[in-house]
């Protein structure tokens, strides 16, 4: 599993604890250091635009990470993510639900709806959307936020 934008390493630790071979990556040096300490595993510093894997993963986990990609760059980013998967590999994505793109504290935040994601995913990314659902935010300070969760398969 490629944990793309692993952040603190929370999900990588979960997957490793269940016996999966995990490759955690993050674009932030600070988050890489934090994740390495938390999971006891090397974390590669890698920006989304520099993704360079070719058909090596059965799954890519991008939980609330690709929301930091500008909307104008999402098609190309998803092509690179798709390329990292083996044929029939599975991709999980999540984004805050909506249509906004904003900058806060130097970071980009891109929100998506199911229609927008369906268009992007079916736009030459060699992916097929299998399922999507909306979930509530579990953080207490964001009670009104909704998230869109998507599962795709590489063609």
Language-model segments: which ranges?
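Conserved class I S-adenosyl-L-methionine
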Residues: 1-5
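Class I SAM-dependent methyltransferase SAM/SAH-binding core
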Residues: 8-50
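A short acidic, Gly/Pro-enriched loop at the edge of an enzyme's catalytic core
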Residues: 49-60
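A short SAM/SAH-binding and catalytic strip from SAM-dependent methyltransferases
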Residues: 59-73
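A short glycine-rich, Lys/Arg-flanked "PGG" loop and its adjoining helix->strand segment in the class I
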Residues: 75-87
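Conserved beta-strand signature within the Rossmann-like core of class I S-adenosyl-L-methionine
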Residues: 88-95
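Acceptor-substrate binding/catalytic loop of class I
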Residues: 93, 101-116, 139-140
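Conserved S-adenosyl-L-methionine
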Residues: 127-137
